[in-house]
Amino acid sequence: MRLAYWMYEGTAHHGVGRIANSMRNVHAVFHAPQGDDYVNAIFAMLDRTPNFPAMTTSVVSGTDLARGTIRLPDTLRQVEERVHPDLIVVVASCSTILLQENLEIAAQHAGLQCEVMVYDANPYRMQEIVAAESLFTDLVKRFAKPQPRTERPTVNILGPASLGFHARHDLISLRRMLKTLGLEVNVVAPWGASIADLRRLPAAWLTIAPYRELGLRAAIYLEEQFGVPALLDAPIGVQPTLRWIERLRELLAQAGADVPMPPLTAFSLDGMSAPSAVPWFARTADMDSFSGKPAFVFGDATHVVGVTRFLRDELGMPIAGAGTYVKHQADWVREQLTGYVDEVLVTDEFQVVADRIAALRPELVCGTQMERHTSRRYDLNCMVISPPTHIENHLLAYRPFLGFDGADVIADEVYTTCTLGMEKHLIDLFGDAGLDLPEKTERTPVAEPAPVAATVESPQPQNEPAIAVASAPSLTSAPATPTPAAVVDPVWAADAEAMLKKVPFFVRGRVRGNVEKYARQRGHAVITAEVLLAAKEELGA
């Protein structure tokens, strides 16, 4: 555990909350100080469900610590009386774990009728993804019992969960494809599953676990312990979906079920046309221009691999770079992206990713909410393809990422993300003639930076641009010969900004980056029109 400005994953008890909030008649109780109940607000804001989050905070206060008392037994009794759950999962937050209290004994003193599970989610060893995956796997191991196989072929779907990225939409897409194949769903878990449903998991003929982050270990356990074969691929894209369907039919055939392949039109929404428009749309003039637009992809393991392959294999876009923050899946990502990128960026520090994006200046960034902020800073196109996300990525409408429907959704996102903004380019070229737009407020000229001595005693803040200047040059004349002893992050003068606006928007970011690089190499603290012209002359742009 570490303090961070932004984090790609939530804390361990956040992951526990995702599992409890996904399941029916399961409730999480957090042994935590008042400040750690922010998790409840996150679920209430983002999850878009009519129910209150299935979690309660048993508050630990300074008074309790001074008196040597603990409120947990009373809280557990109140939860049982109010909610009547089948299972209560008790977990300490990242703050109270430091107290090293024995929550097992405290839970026993509550004298509950329902089952209680004290889960050791140590934030010094795990974060959201590992905590959620480990808890779900433990629940499957605890409750899954040997069952006779269902009469007709059925499948389990493991992985969709509360606050999952488009998880409910993916579930609809998977159900549609399975129904087209004539297959029934045995259990979906953790989303909507009860403890009784977990007991029925071994009755299925096959387990589908499309996400590397959640459901993978449980699917492997069911295969090893009960002989239920597992399909662990994610059908992201048209060709991967076709291969996924074929693999599903092969596994069921090995289990003794013959699943005939219906015509492809049966998978479409109208039942008459092709299941996806991507194959022909990728060959149109609209998409032909995308073949030269480099993309950078970053996020969780599942979506990074799926989207990277989709962009290059089906849309013809070159991949400038790819990476993931899920470190325990890094080797799998490297294996899957062999031949797509020379190196996979593995980091959970958003500033490292931001620096890579700034260096590459791709035409399209596919990432998380953090990459959206970074792209806005550098005026780059960005689409969100992975958690963490904000409210706009928890949609009410049907927007899956898996299956044929998901391929169309991703292609639409790529197309609209890269082409919207053309009106901005036209306004840059022709002004607002005929548009009746209000006059744009003139930018306030950038003031000359005050001289700052670069000393060890006065370091610059890590997340703020550092300006180290011996003496601020005039904004109207080209700076003198560089003094590269101190690295600078140059400031743009008003005349240079005005000149930069004349550059077409789709290459403006790259020009800005090249000019700033030129200025840094020569020690220019302020980029004036003269500096910009000098950079243009030297770079030949």
Swiss-Prot record:
Cofactors named for this entry: [4Fe-4S] cluster
The record's free-text note on cofactor binding: Binds 1 [4Fe-4S] cluster per heterodimer. The cluster is bound at the heterodimer interface by residues from both subunits.
Top-level taxon of the source organism: Bacteria
Record: active site: 286
UniProt: [4Fe-4S] cluster binding residues: 36
EC numbers: 1.3.7.7
Catalyses which reaction(s): chlorophyllide a + oxidized 2[4Fe-4S]-[ferredoxin] + 2 ADP + 2 phosphate = protochlorophyllide a + reduced 2[4Fe-4S]-[ferredoxin] + 2 ATP + 2 H2O
Binding-site list for substrate: 421-422
Pathways per UniProt: Porphyrin-containing compound metabolism; bacteriochlorophyll biosynthesis (light-independent)
Keywords: 4Fe-4S, ATP-binding, Bacteriochlorophyll biosynthesis, Chlorophyll biosynthesis, Iron, Iron-sulfur, Metal-binding, Nucleotide-binding, Oxidoreductase, Photosynthesis
Chain ranges passing through the membrane: none
Single annotated GO MF: ATP binding
GO biological process: light-independent bacteriochlorophyll biosynthetic process; photosynthesis, dark reaction
Role noted for this protein: Component of the dark-operative protochlorophyllide reductase (DPOR) that uses Mg-ATP and reduced ferredoxin to reduce ring D of protochlorophyllide (Pchlide) to form chlorophyllide a (Chlide). This reaction is light-independent. The NB-protein (BchN-BchB) is the catalytic component of the complex.
Family: Belongs to the ChlB/BchB/BchZ family.
PANTHER family cross-referenced by the UniProt entry: LIGHT-INDEPENDENT PROTOCHLOROPHYLLIDE REDUCTASE SUBUNIT B
Self-association state and partner proteins as the record states: Protochlorophyllide reductase is composed of three subunits; BchL, BchN and BchB. Forms a heterotetramer of two BchB and two BchN subunits.
Protein's name in the database: Light-independent protochlorophyllide reductase subunit B
Organism: Chloroflexus aurantiacus (strain ATCC 29366 / DSM 635 / J-10-fl)
